[in-house]
Design a protein with these regions (language model features):
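Structural signature of the urease/amidohydrolase superfamily beta/alpha-barrel
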Residues: 52-53
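Catalytic core of pol beta-like nucleotidyltransferases
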Residues: 1-36, 41-48, 57-112
Length: 112
């Protein structure tokens, strides 16, 4: 039962967690847009949910998606207060792929 309460408390703070990610993206100097997608954007979170964050980057950012994901999460945790065990999933896409996806999903834009 403790895990359920702990996880729900984390999930209720999803806006702060996403803000930490957006601030990390900004502090890394990335020209990127950040959106919340999935259950949080559609208002259907459950105790087993994670928070899906879409980061739309330029093709010229010069870093692969796995390395970029690592850099963003590390910066968000080390400098912007994202808990290390927060249930967040980063989806890194180039802008042209994002444009197609954004047309079909409910999204919440996030500003740093």
């Amino acid at each position: 039962m403790f895990w359920v309460r702990y996880h729900l408390r984390h999930l209720k703070a999803w806006r702060e967690a996403v803000k930490a990610v957006a601030n990390a993206v900004k502090s890394l100097g990335l020209d990127a847009d950040v959106y919340v997608i999935g259950g949080a954007a559609e208002r259907r979170l459950t105790v087993l949910s994670d928070i899906d964050v879409l980061v739309c980057v330029d093709e010229s950012c010069g870093v692969g998606p796995w390395e970029l994901r690592r850099r963003i999460l590390t910066r968000a945790m080390d400098e912007h207060g994202l808990p290390w065990d927060y249930p967040i999933e980063l989806h890194i896409l180039v802008r042209r792929e994002c444009e197609k996806l954004l047309k079909s999903l409910k999204v919440i834009p996030v500003k740093a």
